[in-house]
Regions:
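Zn2+-dependent metallopeptidase catalytic core
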Residues: 71-77, 115, 147-163, 167, ...
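Surface-exposed beta-strand/loop patches in extracellular or lumenal glycoproteins
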Residues: 40-72, 140-157
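Post-HExxH zinc-binding segment in Zn-dependent metallohydrolases
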Residues: 268-270, 275, 304-305, 316-367
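A surface-exposed beta-strand-loop module
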Residues: 32-33, 64-127
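Extended, low-hydrophobicity, Ser/Thr/Pro/Gly-biased non-transmembrane segments
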Residues: 112-193
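C-terminal recognition in membrane/secretory proteostasis and scaffolding
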Residues: 335-336, 344-602
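Juxtacatalytic substrate-recognition/specificity segment
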Residues: 195-324
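Short, hydrophobic/aromatic-enriched beta-strand segments in well-ordered soluble domains
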Residues: 42-48, 58, 98-128, 150-158, ...
Length: 602
């Protein structure tokens, strides 16, 4: 600890007022009057530009979380007034848009309460000593005027502080150049720990709630890991793309076991169960390092290197793209490379994680295209969890592309060149990229049989040629087709971060136990069902070879915790192990070294 503390503002009060020279600025005030009611109070002043009617909306979703959330559902006590405080007529234009009759006022002020009672990566939360929100939650916008700059001030209980990705200091105002920057701003208010360190000349802040979760041992390990992650990824991409970066951590306790992260242009917001955050000695949990590496690499891949289907963002509706396998899955691959290249992971850890990705790909209930999965992620399919599939399959695809590029070029080219070219030729030119653009770059950098690879494995459903592909980097594949434990339940993650049974397979162990749709999975045998790890993979490994053994399912049904009894069943499945060849050829060794160290050449 002991680093410089940045961006901390104490209680601020603010009267919304129009200031002629900056009339185009939208001004917001966020206040907390009664934390126990879980209500933020929001005021926003919009210039009318002489319009008789102003349309104001809240987003339907948050970029990075590809799910319609409809944030307008949390609004109550909406009102609209003119510059002198006189009430103005308003009504609802659609589910998320308010229509206000301006009465020829030069500016109007809208106000509302916002319910914040959910632990989620893209939903607001407020309690006795702490609050958290994303810009998409609280800040209305004027459709068609996302270019407007904005200012935000806070009115908070005594002793509360503010840490936000927005630019500002002291009591504010905090500023955003346009609505996209405002919508992307993660914010903590309340009492929590704030630390900071400088990496590559830029400040990196760490905000952790609750404060007592950030012990000296945790601080030491967190700072060391983040420094290595940032240095490694900054070096790959040519330096940090931000003025300052913030890592927001929300450490939660049982019975909620939700974990994950959400990327932002100058921040990441991570939720982690206390049991997975650190151990008793303050060492970071197994999921922590890959999570931080993944979210940090999103600074480039998706926040800046973005599919054209999401350029610019449309907050009103779904934005479909077939490229989430690249934006999320290849980001997973680069997170793994970061951990290897920085020394945070050993070679064995890297190969084990890759093998686990392969296990997940092969365990899919049916052959599927990662492009189709990218598009379908918005609907939370009943039988296939698309988002849980294009992450591992995209990661494996990234590694196969990397090895193929290095093999074809004698290690003078690799996927690093492709990701950097996407950054300079598309993001830095102010545009998104398409599948055709990506394929053109892969072709330019020497990807052999690109059209065939794309049609078979990315847009197609053929199994990956693991053995032939990995052999080029001197990696041996141990493929075992065995009987693996099979529970027989499809349980997607709910908005509350719980795994809820949706479909129970006929004749399965789950059906024999009496598991029913709507049951919340808590434990499968002795395995806690948590989102910070793939519990289904853990289940298969833990109960391998135990067909017929007793198996207890702990679930929550109708508010009660009950135990259901069944027996382990198995079905045919594939598991993988990866290891380095003890006697690689010179070329194999060169390719592996280039991949592992991020180098090209002889």
């Amino acid at each position: 600890m002991g680093g410089r503390r940045l961006g901390v503002a104490l209680v601020a009060t603010w009267a919304l007022a129009s200031r002629g020279a900056t009339a185009q600025v939208v001004r917001y005030e966020v206040s907390v009057l009664s934390p126990g009611a879980h209500l933020f109070h929001v005021k926003a002043e919009f210039p009318t530009d002489g319009k008789d009617t102003l349309y104001l909306a809240l987003p339907a979703w948050s970029p990075g979380n590809y799910e319609i959330q409809n944030y307008a559902r949390y609004v109550r006590h909406f009102s609209a007034t003119g510059v002198s405080g006189q009430p103005l007529f308003w009504d609802r234009a659609d589910k998320e848009t308010w229509r206000v009759a301006t009465g020829k006022q030069r500016a109007i002020t809208v106000a509302f309460d916002y319910l914040a009672d959910t632990i989620d990566l893209s939903i607001a939360r407020l309690q006795a000593d702490f609050g958290q929100f994303l810009g998409t939650n609280l800040f209305m916008y004027q459709p068609g005027r996302l270019d407007r700059p904005s200012e935000v001030r806070f009115a908070l209980p005594a002793g509360w502080q503010v840490t936000t990705a927005l630019k500002g200091s002291g009591s504010g105002p905090y500023t955003a150049a346009d609505y996209h920057e405002l919508a992307d701003a993660e914010t903590f208010v309340g009492r929590y720990s704030v630390d900071s360190l400088k990496v590559d000349g830029k400040w990196l802040r760490i905000a952790v709630w609750p404060a007592d979760a950030y012990t000296p041992a945790v601080a030491r390990n967190m700072r060391s890991s983040l420094e290595k992650i940032a240095q490694t990824e900054n070096r790959l991409m040519g330096g940090p793309p931000y003025d300052a970066y913030t890592v927001f951590f929300n450490v939660i306790h049982d019975p909620i076991s939700f974990g994950g992260g959400l990327e932002h242009s100058a921040a990441q917001y991570d939720i982690m169960p206390a049991s997975a955050f650190v151990d008793l000695a303050g060492n970071l949990g197994d999921f922590m390092v890959p999570l931080m590496s993944h979210e940090y690499f999103h600074l480039w891949n998706v926040k800046r290197i973005r599919p054209s289907g999401m350029w610019p963002y449309d907050y009103h509706a779904e934005q479909y793209t077939p490229l989430l396998w690249w934006s999320e899955g290849v980001t997973d691959y680069y997170a793994d490379l970061t951990n290897l290249r920085s020394g945070l992971w050993s070679v064995d850890q890297f190969l084990h994680n890759t093998a686990t990705d392969m296990d997940q790909v092969e365990a899919a209930p049916e052959p599927w295209s990662e492009e189709d999965g990218s598009v379908a992620t918005w609907i939370n399919e009943v039988f296939v969890n698309s988002s849980q599939l294009y992450y591992p399959k995209g990661a494996v695809t990234g590694m196969l592309l990397d090895i193929a590029l290095r093999d074809a070029s004698n290690n003078t080219r690799g996927l690093d060149d492709v990701i950097r070219a996407l950054y300079t030729r598309y993001y830095q030119q102010g545009r998104g990229f398409t599948t055709e653009n990506l394929l053109a770059l892969l072709r330019e950098f020497g990807m052999p049989d690109l059209d065939g690879f794309y049609q078979r494995y990315i847009n197609g459903r053929e199994p990956f040629p693991y053995e032939a592909a990995f052999a080029k980097a001197g990696i041996a594949v141990n493929r075992q087709i065995t009987s693996v434990p099979f529970l027989g339940v499809h349980a997607p993650l709910s908005d509350q971060g719980r795994w809820v049974a949706q479909v129970v397979e006929p004749g399965s162990a789950a059906e024999a136990a009496g598991l029913a749709p709507g049951d919340v999975l808590l434990k499968i045998g002795d395995i806690a069902v948590r989102n910070d790890e793939d519990w289904s993979v853990t289940f298969r490994r833990r109960y391998q070879g135990q067909a017929g053994a007793p198996l207890a399912l702990t679930v929550e049904r109708d508010g009660r915790t009950i135990t259901l009894n069944t027996k382990v069943q198995e079905r045919s499945g594939t598991t993988f192990g990866l290891s380095r060849n003890a006697t690689p050829t010179a070329k194999q060794a060169k390719i592996w070294q280039g991949l592992a160290a991020g180098t090209t050449g002889g």
